Amino acid sequence: MTNDSASRTPSDNTELTEMQRYVTQQRGTEPAFSGKLLHNKRTGVYHCLCCQAPLFYSDSKYDSGCGWPSFDQPVSSEAVRYLEDDSHNMRRIEIRCGQCDAHLGHVFPDGPKTTGERYCVNSASLSFIDDVDGERVDG
């Protein structure tokens, strides 16, 4: 796995927006309640914006009220990787794309009863592909 974050771009070779670059390459966080995919209710799959690896199914998304898209589990155990994050004087678990290492967000142990986990993900790190019409929406 490479750590050359400056060379990563979305799979269609378009440029990352400033916010997408900040989130995925610099471990940033978009402002709460600002993400394009926060209120998305369509059926489909959420992919990594940078490499298009599948990350979360829409049926695992729920409204946690935290201001970022929340999921109770990834599509597979290999979809995301976990790192300890002690930044900002907090102990958290960072989640990154299991394929390209792009920063996604964090996972917390306060999720729904199904898994007990809340994957709190920045919209700017995701692409959504609709199951019905195949439309792709980048966060």
From Swiss-Prot:
Record carries keyword rRNA-binding: no
Entry EC number(s): 1.8.4.12
User: What is annotated as the active site?
Assistant: C120
What is a single Pfam family found in this protein's UniProt entry?
SelR
Of the GO CC terms on this record, one is: cytoplasm
The name this protein carries in UniProt is: Peptide methionine sulfoxide reductase MsrB
- Keywords, in A-Z order: Metal-binding, Oxidoreductase, Zinc
**Database matches in PANTHER family:** METHIONINE SULFOXIDE REDUCTASE, METHIONINE-R-SULFOXIDE REDUCTASE B1
Annotated family: Belongs to the MsrB Met sulfoxide reductase family.
Q: Which residues cross the membrane?
A: none
Q: Where does Zn(2+) bind?
A: C48, C51, C97, C100
The cross-references to NCBIfam families, in alphabetical order and at most eight, read:
peptide-methionine (R)-S-oxide reductase MsrB (TIGR00357)
Please list the GO biological process terms of this entry: protein repair; response to oxidative stress
SUPFAM superfamilies per record: Mss4-like
Q: Describe the reaction catalysed, as an equation.
A: L-methionyl-[protein] + [thioredoxin]-disulfide + H2O = L-methionyl-(R)-S-oxide-[protein] + [thioredoxin]-dithiol
Domain MsrB: residue ranges: 9-131
Q: Which organism is it from?
A: Pectobacterium carotovorum subsp. carotovorum (strain PC1)
Cofactor annotation: Zn(2+)
Q: What note does UniProt attach to the cofactor annotation?
A: Binds 1 zinc ion per subunit. The zinc ion is important for the structural integrity of the protein.
From the UniProt record, list the coiled-coil ranges. none
Q: Which GO molecular function annotations are given, in alphabetical order?
A: peptide-methionine (R)-S-oxide reductase activity; zinc ion binding
